[in-house]
From Swiss-Prot:
Pfam families: Ribosomal_S2
Gene Ontology CC annotations of this record: small ribosomal subunit
Alphabetical UniProt keywords: Ribonucleoprotein, Ribosomal protein
UniProt GO BP: translation
GO MF, one annotated term: structural constituent of ribosome
Protein name as it appears in the record: Small ribosomal subunit protein uS2
Coiled-coil residues: none
Family: Belongs to the universal ribosomal protein uS2 family.
Matches recorded under Gene3D superfamilies: Glucose-6-phosphate isomerase like protein, domain 1 (3.40.50.10490)
Originating organism: Thermoplasma acidophilum (strain ATCC 25905 / DSM 1728 / JCM 9062 / NBRC 15155 / AMRC-C165)
Length: 199
C-alpha cells in the first residue's frame, strides 16, 4: 500500500525538493530516482516523504528543549529559526562554535539529546560533536552527501530556498501532530512562506 503523501508529489517537485546535484555519493544511491539529461541527479520524493514521517514520530518523543537544529547555509537560517520557534527546539545558525556540545565550561554549551543538521558537509563541526557525545543525528542529505554517522537520512535538495522551507515546515507540522499539539493538519497555522528565507 502506498504511504500517505504529506503534500502532493507535484508540490514537492514544484518546490525543487527533488533536485539533486551533478555529483552523486554512493551513500545516496538508494534515494536517487533518476539522472536527468543534463547530468543532474533527481531524488525520489516518495522516500523524502517517508523519511519525514519517520523523523516526525522520532522527534516527537523528545522534549522540545532536547532537540538542536543547525544550519551553516544562509537559505536555511529562516527555516531553521522558524522550525525552532514552532517546535520549541533550539536553533544554531551560522558558525557552530567548537565545544558547543562537548565542553560544559563554555557559556554557549548546549546539552541536547538529538540533532538535526541541514547539510552534513557544511555542518561538519556539529556532526563531529554529536558523534563524540553519542546522540542521534538526523540529516537533510542531498545527492552528493556522505552519510557516515547519520542515523536518519532525509533525502532532499538541502541548498534551495523553497525546498528548505518545505522540509522544515513539514517536519514541524509532523512533530506537532505526533505530539498531539494539533489533531489535524488544518490546525497548523503556519504556511510554507513563513519558513522561507527572504531574498
Amino acid at each position: 500500500m502506498d504511504e500517505e503523501m504529506l503534500i502532493p508529489e507535484e508540490e514537492y517537485q514544484k518546490s525543487g525538493v527533488h533536485i539533486g546535484t551533478q555529483v552523486k555519493s554512493s551513500d545516496m544511491k538508494p534515494y536517487i530516482f533518476k539522472i536527468r539529461n543534463d547530468g543532474l541527479y533527481i531524488l525520489d520524493v516518495k522516500k523524502t516523504n517517508s523519511k519525514l514521517i519517520v523523523a516526525g514520530k522520532m522527534l516527537a518523543r523528545f522534549e522540545p528543549q532536547d532537540i538542536l537544529v543547525v544550519a551553516q547555509r544562509q537559505y536555511a537560517f529562516r527555516p531553521v529559526a522558524k522550525f525552532a520557534e514552532v517546535t520549541g527546539a533550539t536553533a544554531i545558525t551560522g558558525r557552530f562554535n567548537p565545544g558547543t556540545l562537548t565542553n560544559p565550561s563554555l557559556k554557549f554549551y548546549k546539552e541536547v539529546k538529538v540533532i538535526i543538521v541541514t547539510d552534513p558537509l557544511a555542518d561538519v563541526q556539529a556532526m563531529k560533536e554529536a558523534v563524540k557525545i553519542g546522540i542521534p543525528i538526523i540529516a537533510l542529505c542531498d545527492a552528493n552527501n556522505k552519510t557516515d554517522f547519520v542515523d536518519l537520512i532525509i533525502p532532499t535538495n538541502n541548498k534551495g530556498r523553497r525546498s528548505l522551507a518545505v522540509i522544515y515546515w513539514l517536519l514541524a507540522r509532523e512533530i506537532l501532530k505526533n505530539r498531539g499539539t494539533i489533531t489535524s493538519y488544518d490546525q497548523f497555522k503556519y504556511t510554507i512562506d513563513d519558513f522561507e528565507a527572504q531574498i
